[in-house]
Swiss-Prot record:
CDD domains assigned: DnaJ, DnaJ_C, DnaJ_zf
A single cellular component GO annotation: cytoplasm
Protein name in UniProt: Chaperone protein DnaJ
Domain J span(s) in chain numbering: 7-73
HAMAP family, sorted: DnaJ
Assigned protein family: Belongs to the DnaJ family.
Record flagged with keyword GTP-binding: no
CXXCXGXG motif-type repeats, residues: 156-163, 173-180, 199-206, 213-220
Biological process per Gene Ontology, one example term: DNA replication
Cofactor field: Zn(2+)
Amino acid sequence: MKKEKKDYYEILGVPRDATQEEIKRAYKRLVKEWHPDRHPENRKEAEQRFKEIQEAYEVLSDPQKRAMYDRFGYVGEQPTYQETESGGFFDDIFRDFENIFNRDIFDVFFGERPHQEERREYARRGEDIRYEIEVTLSDLINGAEIPVEYERYETCPRCGGTGVEPNAGYMDCPSCGGTGRIREERRSFFGYFVSERTCERCGGTGKIPREYCHECGGSGRVLRKVRRTVKIPPNVEDGTHLRITGGGNAGYYGGPYGDLIIIVRVKPDPRFKKSGSDLVYDVTIDYLQAILGTTVEVPLPEGGTTMLKIPPGTQPETVFRLKGKGLPNRYGRRGDLIVNVHVEIPKSLSREERKVLEELAKKRGVTIG
């Protein structure tokens, strides 16, 4: 006889497109409302209602179970077969054979593919969190300590990550009777089949919580804001990934925390071009300064400036190298600050300037015009 299907959405009082947050809120409200201790005069009905709420939440809070429920209208219980005039009898057999055994029916008889491994609940590591930070060239000189703030899932303080309401304890799983396995016997067109699989409701443990944690809703994790200081080593490259062990999300079922992965972005400095541990700075001087010599102010990456003497007769595109004024390399030794000198030649001259230059050209024996 076909088992009457339960409408889990109706039990929790949520629409079919409800979000996980809406499902969790509804569950928290209903378990408080229908807790058997609150209904001593009608405890049996309250216990039944309480179990239905727990069962509905177990399915709808699990994306995989919810997807199966939305598609087939059941989780872990197979429908009976009915022959129809449209020939759907065989379609049902082929489809539900795959649901039961996790294999195509022809694979079973002809061995085309290996059996898929059954899903089990187990301790799993939490997810990693990626976080981008921006650093300046001055941060790359000696390294830096940069404060960051981000959200992550932490172990629920109320249940310690178990997802079970404190003192509620566990009970035998009603789906498998506490064995952790579901045995199924089927008669079909091809013969008599017996299969055994892991119970989806308890994940093979044979136990389920009597009541889920009121703070985390059974997930064992709560969202929290975290503030910490990240150490940036000297002269990191743009796009460098720094891994902080245990800085990510809390694990599942007692699993370890994931990591915090810091992605370093070096903020471009319009004054310099970076070339390994060297920095390149361009300076433009007047042609008279190149001829007569001058002193120019050169900025430093850590802040402040230094004075660079340009000797008389400096040619265009002359390169000066300031030793040890660049960025530190992996061994802690600083590179150089390379100064490229560009000479600007005026496109037009005043009458007086031209006269002076013509007289100078005549004295030097330079042909002009």
